[in-house]
Amino acid sequence: MSQSELRQVIDAETAEPGWKSLYKVGGIAALIMVAFPLAEVAINFLPGVAGLSQGTVTVIDWFTLFQNHSFLALRNLGLLNIVGAAFLAPTILAIYSALRRDHEAYGAFGTILFFVGLAVYLAGSRAFPMLSLSSQYAVATTDAQRALLAAAGQAMLAEGQSRAGIPLIEFACLVISTVTLRGRVFSKATACAGILGNALLIIVEIIATSSGGLPNAGFVIAICGGLSLMTWYLLVGRRLLQLGRT
């Protein structure tokens, strides 16, 4: 049996009618995911963004940024990561569906890890609670109200922007990519791109956590990991759309 004939058989086995819509949604979501790292970089180069971001030192600075540039404030507190993780959810479900015939247990393990990581990350996000506090601060009528809201915002900033769920999400995607390497549905190139990208970003998280920042070498690793993940999104998205059309 030729390679193309084998692929047709695999597609026929995998693309059950009830799952085709999920494959299409997951494929489109994966392709959209490519835009998020590009948007993150593009925003950094917009005029005035660097100055506004560096000016957020106190909680009042943050409230002012929220009132004048709410999108930038949300973005600085991880908005694109939040939206990106949400977009990745249907893609992970679609990958699990494609893998369930041959590797259901490991696929389910990776999928569960992903959603646990997503829940932890969303629960620890400071973006929307800070937006709510800034809105209340803007309409507060007494000094006591403003002082109370400022104290609540300061406590939130003191806790820091939680990234506890991000390494878990990356590890889940690493598990899923490893499973695809052993399966027949996705190409080896797709699996390797996912393994490399997620492994590198896990290393970046470890470096950033242990050193309290990201040295130049860490930025290089992050760029390589980001490019690998973008490649993974493209390859996964294309393959899922193929399954959705079968």
Predicted features, each with a name:
Residues 2-246:
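Hydrophobic, aromatic-enriched alpha-helical segments typical of multi-pass transmembrane helices
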